């Protein structure tokens, strides 16, 4: 059997021999000094089934080893990473990118048509400079607002973590902390993200990650202009230490005349005031959730009028200089709302036990006229008899909780200590 590349028995002339892979920053890892192994014609591409050069490396400490999954020709056709198959420009799945650019790339899937299509694309790639994608993607020049909102601007290195240890899930892992796999609870098997296919990811069909991102894009918030037509100022937050006034002016000058740009380095924000309301509305629409400078996504909102900020300061109890006022001592706090009529009638404010009917107090009535008893010596006539002790069959008053409730507290036992 011939094994030379010149033999067309197995179409070896189309086998790939590369010196460096096409990778995204996330798959490459955060360590700039990595050791990468190269295996010439090590595996076949999972899309076109042709042998290609396989690269294998470890992206960082406590990360799993990664390798290239598709050949560079298939990677250039879709402008994706050879490992994760996400778009190199936006970091999104192919299905989301194609939906944002409003085009559908129908690649052949049968063996013969796929090989013929790949050879034609390789010829087109060889005639280009290799910096731009070919095919339908190379003809799409317009950008999408949805892609700018969903784009991942920073690497997500947690994607390189090891897989979950199956022995730990069964309770049989004996490696402990030395186990190279994760000791975590696996995801729900019914979760759509648990079942992913590399071919579905490449062709942009039935991708659960793409479906999740498209649903998020449909429910993404909007920035509505304020009702006050005099507001022409935009707030830009999250500047950091690297973004300057020149960077902001280079972005916002295209929307209209800029009156002033005020950068507050202490709060890491800026205020851009336009000359007209129309320019401010266009800038807010084109920059909301899409303003990225030096790989940093900035937060764009509408500014507030001086009257609205003054009312808010009065409500918060702050002065114009931002000093918080202390509450005046001696003033009562907020009182609870009064109870309803039914609740107030049945409320027990002193936690007293329920008692029966009120005790009857023996009050002597005045005698009929003409039959008044003689007054005691030394006293004038009186109208009421002195109160006597209650009869034994009558109920005593309720329980006593405080000394002031005792009816015999003031000199009731004086007769016991007096001399006979």
From Swiss-Prot:
Keywords: Acetylation, Cytoplasm, Isopeptide bond, Metal-binding, mRNA processing, mRNA splicing, Nucleus, Phosphoprotein, RNA-binding, Spliceosome, Transport, Ubl conjugation, Zinc, Zinc-finger. The modification Phosphoserine is found at residues 4, 102. The keyword Zinc-finger applies. SUPFAM superfamilies: CCCH zinc finger, RNA-binding domain, RBD. It comes from Bos taurus. Residues 309-318 have a biased composition (Basic and acidic residues). Its main location: nucleus. This is Pre-mRNA-splicing factor RBM22.
């Amino acid at each position: 059997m011939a094994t030379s590349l010149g033999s067309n028995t197995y179409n070896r002339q189309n086998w790939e021999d590369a010196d460096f892979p096409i990778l995204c920053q996330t798959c490459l890892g955060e360590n700039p000094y990595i050791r990468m192994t190269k295996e010439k014609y090590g595996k076949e591409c999972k899309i076109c089934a042709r042998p290609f050069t396989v690269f294998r490396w470890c992206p960082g400490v406590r990360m799993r080893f990664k390798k290239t999954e598709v050949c560079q020709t298939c990677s250039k056709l879709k402008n994706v990473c050879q490992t994760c198959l996400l778009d190199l420009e936006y970091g999104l799945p192919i299905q989301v990118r194609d939906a944002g650019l409003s085009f559908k790339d129908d690649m052949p899937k049968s063996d013969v048509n796929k090989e013929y299509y790949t050879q034609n694309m390789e010829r087109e790639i060889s005639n280009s400079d290799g910096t731009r994608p070919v095919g339908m993607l190379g003809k799409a020049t317009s950008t999408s607002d949805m892609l700018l909102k969903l784009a991942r601007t920073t690497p997500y290195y947690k994607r390189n973590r090891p897989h979950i240890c199956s022995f730990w899930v069964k309770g049989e892992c004996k490696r402990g902390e030395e186990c190279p796999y994760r000791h975590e609870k696996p995801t729900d098997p019914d979760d759509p993200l648990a079942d992913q296919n590399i071919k579905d990811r490449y062709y942009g069909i039935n991708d659960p990650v793409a479906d999740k991102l498209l649903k998020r894009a449909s429910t993404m918030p909007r920035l509505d202009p304020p009702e006050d037509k005099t507001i022409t100022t935009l707030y830009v937050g999250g500047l950091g230490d690297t973004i300057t006034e020149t960077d902001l002016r280079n972005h916002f000058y295209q929307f209209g005349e800029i009156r002033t740009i005020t950068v507050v380095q202490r709060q890491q924000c800026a205020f851009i005031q336009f000359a007209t309301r129309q320019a401010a509305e266009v800038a807010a629409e084109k920059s909301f959730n899409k303003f990225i400078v030096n790989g940093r996504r900035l937060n764009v909102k509408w500014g507030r009028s001086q009257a609205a900020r003054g009312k808010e300061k009065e409500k918060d109890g702050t002065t114009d200089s931002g000093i918080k006022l202390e509450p005046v001592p001696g003033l009562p706090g907020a009182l609870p709302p009064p109870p309803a009529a039914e609740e107030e009638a049945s409320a027990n404010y002193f936690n007293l036990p329920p008692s029966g009917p009120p005790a009857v107090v023996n009050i002597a009535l005045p005698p009929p006229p003409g039959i008044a008893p003689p007054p005691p010596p030394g006293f004038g006539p009186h109208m009421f008899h002195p109160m006597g002790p209650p009869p034994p069959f009558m109920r005593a008053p309720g329980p006593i909780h405080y000394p002031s409730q005792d009816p015999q507290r003031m000199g009731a036992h004086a007769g016991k200590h007096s001399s006979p």
